[in-house]
Amino acid sequence: MSTPAKPTSVESYKRLLSYAFKYKAYFIISFIGFGVFAAMEAQLINILEYFVDRLEGRPSAPVLGLSADVTSSLWFVPISVVVLSIIRGIGAYFGNFYMSLVGLNVITNLRRQIFSQMIYLPQSFYDTKNSGELISLLVYNIEQVTGSVTNAVKTLFRDGMSVAWFLAMMLIINWKLTLAFICVAPVLGGLMYIASKYFRKVSHKIQSAVGRVSHVATESIQGIKLVKSYGGEKYELDRFNDATNQNLHYGTKFERVSAFQTPVLHIVLALALAVTFYLIMILWDSDSSKAVVYATYAAAIAKPFRQLTKINSIIQKGLAAADTIFEVLDLQAEPNSGQQKLNAPKGRVELKDVHFGYNQDTPALNGISFAIEPGQTVALVGSSGSGKSTIVSLLLRFYDNQQGSITIDGTPIQSLELHNLREHIALVNQQTILFNDTIAANIAYGSEHIDEARIQDAAKQANAHDFIMALPNGYQTPAGEDGSRLSGGQRQRIAIARALYKNAPILILDEATSALDNESEKQIQSALDELKQGRTTLVIAHRLSTIENADTILVMDNGRIVEAGNHQTLLDRSGVYANLYHSQFS
């Protein structure tokens, strides 16, 4: 399959602008506001003509229906300056405010779109990304993109129209001098083109460095207990300093070129201005007031033009950020082509000759076949890396098997609508995840409607009700980030309560009691045994004592099932299972 051609800068920027142009009304108001601002800027300079005429005792020309007597009066210039400045301020307000509204809306909508995309991307995407990079994408990159649209457009509107007004007035006053003045435009354009390539290249590296900073910080903060207990503070500081130094290095390179580009452009502009002033002094043959106005326009044009030269670096930063954002937005969501839905399934699960590998060179499962009848419990045991958790991932379609079939009640899971499939499976794994929400919300997670009575029933079955009621606000107590306010055993019992609340016909327990002490495990085992009644249950266990009553125990090794039978049968064989069992109880 051929790789799609990388979009050009123009194509990328058009796509960026499409997000902003959804707010056309704001754009129009902003454009009008900046148009008024630029027009008043030009008229404030025009007032100089009347000022000089007054100083030299010459009558001023009539304007806007005002007679020469009015324009030559003592109060005309001061009053005009105040009135024009007020109108200019009003224009600037509307221009800036409504362009800011565009930026805020673009940031919000783009963040929502990228997060919505991330939520539905396949698990394989997260296997190759770290959380720091993705957080940086949501925060830093999106702000860079928005800046390249709104800030660049704002500068283009405000300063672009100022330059247009100034040049127009200069052409009206003396078109020959003005044409000579603008001959420097090709030189300025060439300098900006050269710089733009460098800006975009370095901006990519800056964003990568920011992602690494976020990644290191996220890892260190999430694992702060491990960091402290192992004395890893200095190591983490060194890692963070390395990441920030890399960011500083590329940021310095970017600013160095940006800082160098600006004075070079100013020097070129100053040379054009110097030539213009020289020509005015030797060639001007009309009123001195016109010469003053023309020279002021030529000098004043430098400021808005200087702002326009900064658009380049802003846009290049945004385009570099847009590359990473559009790369994620253009990814395919996890496959969900299934149309069938199971209503009240019995829960028969069958795997036939299932093969799967995370990469082509290393197969994780080789020809796995087994069936679990409704109400049965099947346990998977084996060493780490034998393929137990991979089977769980395939059942939930975090990945799709490459060969063979997986069915529920005879229906291939690829034929089922994804949400419907997962609706019928409750998972409790060894990595307990709790959200920074109330205990009740964590137990009822994924449900649109919270049933307080069902929550308490589930908590009681999971042996969690008593400790929850002892918390300051009971079920409304915040769990803290990742359940930080709870012990490991408490977090695991809430996770079990969550599975009980879901009341799905298929239950997966992936080391579900691994975080519990022996006493808590005994207390909860009876609840789990009751939960299993009438449900298809797949158990992955390290503690073999927890699966002695399983209907079938499958022993796995290197992606294959090497033994199968109940507890006593496998012990009598004196094979792999018996060795594992005796090693735990020796």
Curated annotation (Swiss-Prot):
It comes from the Bacteria. Its EC number is 7.5.2.6. InterPro entries: AAA+_ATPase (IPR003593), ABC1_TM_dom (IPR011527), ABC1_TM_sf (IPR036640), ABC_transporter-like_ATP-bd (IPR003439), ABC_transporter-like_CS (IPR017871), ABC_transpr_lipidA (IPR011917), P-loop_NTPase (IPR027417), Type_1_exporter (IPR039421). GO terms for molecular function: ABC-type oligopeptide transporter activity; ATP binding; ATP hydrolysis activity; ATPase-coupled lipid transmembrane transporter activity. CDD domains: ABC_6TM_MsbA_like. It holds the Pfam family ABC_tran. GO terms for cellular component: plasma membrane. The keyword Cell inner membrane applies. ATP binds at residues 382-389. Keywords: ATP-binding, Cell inner membrane, Cell membrane, Lipid transport, Membrane, Nucleotide-binding, Translocase, Transmembrane, Transmembrane helix, Transport. It is found in: Cell inner membrane. It catalyses: ATP + H2O + lipid A-core oligosaccharideSide 1 = ADP + phosphate + lipid A-core oligosaccharideSide 2. Residues 28-317 form the ABC transmembrane type-1 domain. It is a multi-pass membrane protein. The chain crosses the membrane at residues 25-45, 74-94, 163-183, 264-284. Residues 349-583 form the ABC transporter domain. Involved in lipopolysaccharide (LPS) biosynthesis. Translocates lipid A-core from the inner to the outer leaflet of the inner membrane. Transmembrane domains (TMD) form a pore in the inner membrane and the ATP-binding domain (NBD) is responsible for energy generation. Belongs to the ABC transporter superfamily. Lipid exporter (TC 3.A.1.106) family. Homodimer. In MsbA the ATP-binding domain (NBD) and the transmembrane domain (TMD) are fused. This is ATP-dependent lipid A-core flippase. The lineage of its organism: Bacteria, Pseudomonadati, Pseudomonadota, Gammaproteobacteria, Cellvibrionales.
